[in-house]
Amino acid sequence: MDITKIPQYELLEHHYVRELESEGYLMRHKKTGARVFILENDDNNKVFNIAFRTVPTDSTGVAQIIEHTVLCGSDRYPVKDPFVELAKGSLNTFLNAMTYSDKTMYPLASTNDKDFFNLMSVYMDGVFHPNITKERKIFEQEGWHYEMDSPDGELTYNGVVYNEMKGAFSSADEILGRQVKAALYPDTTYAYESGGDPEFITDLTYESYLEFYHTYYHPSNSYIYLYGDLDMEKALNWMDHEYLSHYEKKEIDSAVTLQKPFNKMKEISLCYAASEDDDEGTYFTWSKVVSNALDLEKYLAFQVLEYVLLDAPGAPLKQALLDAGIGVDIYGGFEDGILQPSFEVTTKGARQEQREVFVETIEATLRKLAEEGLQKRSLLAGLNSLQFRLKEGDFGRWPKGLMYGLDLFDSWLYDDKAAFLLLETQDAMDELYKKAEGSYFEQLIKECLIDNSFGVVAMAVPKVGLDAENEEKTAEKLRVYKDSLSKEEIEEIVRHTKELKEYQETPSTKEELETIPMLTRADIKREVLPLYNEERSMDGVKVLFHEMSTKKIGYLELVFDADFADLSELPYLSLLKQILGVVAAGEYSYTELMDEVNIHTGGIDPGFVVLQPETGRPTVRFSFRIKAFYHELETAVNLTAKMMYQSDLANEKRLLEIIGETRSQLYERLKSAGHNTSIKRASSYHSESGYLNEIMTGISFYEFLNDLYDHFEERKGMIIEKLRAVSNQLFNKRALLVSFTADKEGYDVLKKAMDTLIKQMPDEPFVKADWNMPLEKKNEGICCASQIQFVGRTGNYKDAGLPFRGSLLVLQNILNYDYLWIRLRVKGGAYGCMSGFGRDGDCYMVSYLDPKLAETNEVYDKLPEYLEQFDQDERSMDRYVIGAISEMDIPKNPAALGVRGLTAYLSGITREQLQKERDEVIDTDAKEIRALVPYAKAVLSNNCLCVVGNENKIKENSSLFTTVRSL
């Protein structure tokens, strides 16, 4: 049957979307008015998404708390956490729920038809028939609740969203961004924090929460998206029969209102929490509302201007601020995903007294650019970069159908008739190429960035001790509240705390679990994916060819063995990665070089990786990852050669800028991704590969950059000399391995492109450096301005003589969605938890945005006891196995398949070995999990602990640490 003829739906628009090679259908469910958009094509990675327009009128986080809770059981699926059951036991390729400023969405993806409909059923039942209306404890667990274990104990707040947002509000960037948004759109829903401000989350009542749900979660306020090679008729009929037809149309006022422009720029000031040793200087943000989400031309043009003005090395706006000494890290750009997008510039590491000169520098630079014109080559580079991204459709591990769906909402949410707008971009791009030859972009700067008072200038200054102040304020508020309670009311809180814990500790019944639809092991493909590795040679250089169709894009990786570098040189190798491509090379200035890269390629990205082969010591490989259409491959290789052999490593001013910017960005990552920081640091205590990773990307590298930056004047000669020495040894023919993903035609083009480069390469003897790594168990508590913790524990089972087994990947799934999840997230209130078991023996467990510390470490210590008593029936084991396979089988595009083959080759992993591991995963039973007790004991016996987080919490638990220090 033709889906346009299904009687329950009205077809509003249908045509072929050439950019996405898809048939597009915009439809409406006749009875309820539910909006439906379909992209039908041959992609077997199918996507479903149901979204609701949600417009908060306060910052209690009600939208996010509902997002967390509707998937905590429903009428048809009464288990306590269907989302987790799906995550640990389906073949999903994506499974999540997301809260935005003005919408809440529930997307999923799967390549398996049966699995896809199972997932869709659980999601639809969750959003329309959730248990939240029957069980208040779901709201308390995920949102917030009072917690007190005894009448004379301390009264505290707990809740997953409450703790998540305490973490978010520990970041200066996040706080500043939220305040700027509130100032730009004061009369709209954007003035409020949809995720919740910890100060106001505890004002949310259960009744207000249910009222918000009943207001917005109705088919008449829904947006449903289907994508891929899917039986659309079946999906549409099923949705109507099972859910939509049960509702009547309802008028729901969820429209997002426009903010009236300002007559003059606003100014705001705020403080962010800092510690004595943890001060990122003053932040400034300059932001202007520049467009409407329904203006496609501006939507694309401002992405180009983001590159031209800010992102490109030497971009005029960024460079003007750096030259004026206003901060060390400048970033920003086009902020979309809302009704009235803005363009903003932020500088970090400035001084408070520079506020006026910050604004003057931006405005003077923009005026000059509008009058004198932008560099045409830079505009072409920005356009080509955007065009390549749109055509390639490479979103890493995220399904492209998911990402197209997210783009769809940037227009559809604000105009029912504009669903196709941001998917059909080619005509608008063609028009922009023509307009770039004239003064269109300069006029845009004048109209939107100069002659426009609809904006905000914000300043955020560090305040030492603000975290402690806020903690004391919260504690005092709770003390006053407790003092106001009667004895009976206090006993009621204690009783309710106990009841909530009992609720959290009570597992779903066998009957409840069996309501969740699931696959069996028989639905899993047993055969492992091939490696697509064919060894070839070019003029004495080994080539790893991964032959497959790539739409005439060549994915090239030039991989250099960097094991010649001694331990003191490896941080310089890491710094070199930051420098190449953003300094002058050959006849090109650094701005011109990046323009040439973007005009001719889809990117030339230097990088490195630390690998632990099956035998022997770890290895460091430095690479250039290049992607270009076949006809541009030769130019791409020539540009890479210039970066390798003609980069200007002696430009002192540029070098200092790069070191300062890298230091600033790394600091932000170390703090905001504290789970990675703690794992990396703890691994360096016992693991050689962990040690190398840490000195090149972790806290040690940050300290190295700090030292270079603080002593640059006296050491600049030595720094330049070290960089040259590392570079000269690195790009050596004998150290090179070429990895190439394309078809035969592409390979023939590559041979010609590589010929000149290989002939000009030095051909010197290659000698590996001796690495005597000073491994030392430091067990550090690392304090930073944060309201929560990241608690990491690492170890190694191979040190105990134990081999890698596929069942460890099943154990990882069990920990992530059962053992750790229940104890750290459900009961402990941490936002997240994860674990990993590597082939090299290195393992970790870590919590994310965690209010606890010692209690979390105790959970890690009790893992062997849990495994000794582990006993699950076959259905439960099927679920764990399927979840592990799902993680292994994430669909990969050609570029990712090439990287997979290369990584296996460098690590000494064969297809036979991968097949053995897959068989072990599929055949894992409860007995096999119990047999992993020695592994857990071996890992924990290393007792390597690192915690990043709140200073007071770390000092309260100082007995756990050998060292307590600041970040």
Regions found by a protein language model. Name each.
Residues 1-47:
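Non-catalytic terminal extensions that flank enzyme cores
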Residues 158, 210-241, 698, 719-754, ...:
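Non-catalytic, conformational "gating/processing" segments within enzyme and secreted inhibitor domains
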Residues 150-219, 225-243, 247-273, 278-280:
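Hydrophobic, small-residue-rich alpha-helical packing segments that form membrane-like cores
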